[in-house]
Amino acid sequence: MLVAAVFSNAENARKIADSLARYGIRAIAAASGSAVLRQMQAVTLVVCGARLEDMTAPRLRRMLPAEIPMLLLAPGAPQLAGIENLPAGLTRAQLCEIVLHHIGAQEALVARAKRAMIRRGGVDEAAAHRLLQKHAMNSGVSLRRAAEEILQKYGEDESI
């Protein structure tokens, strides 16, 4: 799981990435949306400001796969589809808790897909994980999307 902290001010991006790292969250800092797009396969969540070095948050949202959540740290910004606006006055600790919640939901989805593969595919946990990663890479989708596809394949997608 990799979180991208993307802000036009590179120092702010670094501070947020460092805060996330202190909570045990793998994070990268970037000032541009294009930097995130280059690492799109690895990124599982984006935390960003309204304006980035080379584009706006809504433009980045349109370029990212729908299954990659975007959290917007821009109090007063209009609510847009696919972007979760975070409230004003959020502390770094509160931001980290929100990110952990999102990551936990994704990890639960991946775990469900692995359990389905173990039950129906006759593989062990390590093999299920490798197969899930391979499916994501071969399909060019995120691990979350690959897990959703596996659950759909096995008819266990009712809560997606």
Describe the role of every protein-language-model region.
Residues 46, 85-86:
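Two-component signal transduction core modules
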Residues 19, 86-105:
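Receiver (REC) domain switch/output surface
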Residues 25-31:
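Short hydrophobic/Thr-rich beta-strand motif most characteristic of the beta2 strand and flanking loop
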Residues 106-160:
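C-terminal output/effector regions of signal-responsive regulators
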Residues 13, 33-37, 42-68:
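Conserved phosphotransfer microenvironments
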Residues 75-85:
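Alpha4 helix (beta4-alpha4-beta5 surface) of REC/receiver domains from two-component response regulators
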Residues 1-10, 16-20, 46:
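Conserved acidic segment of CheY-like receiver
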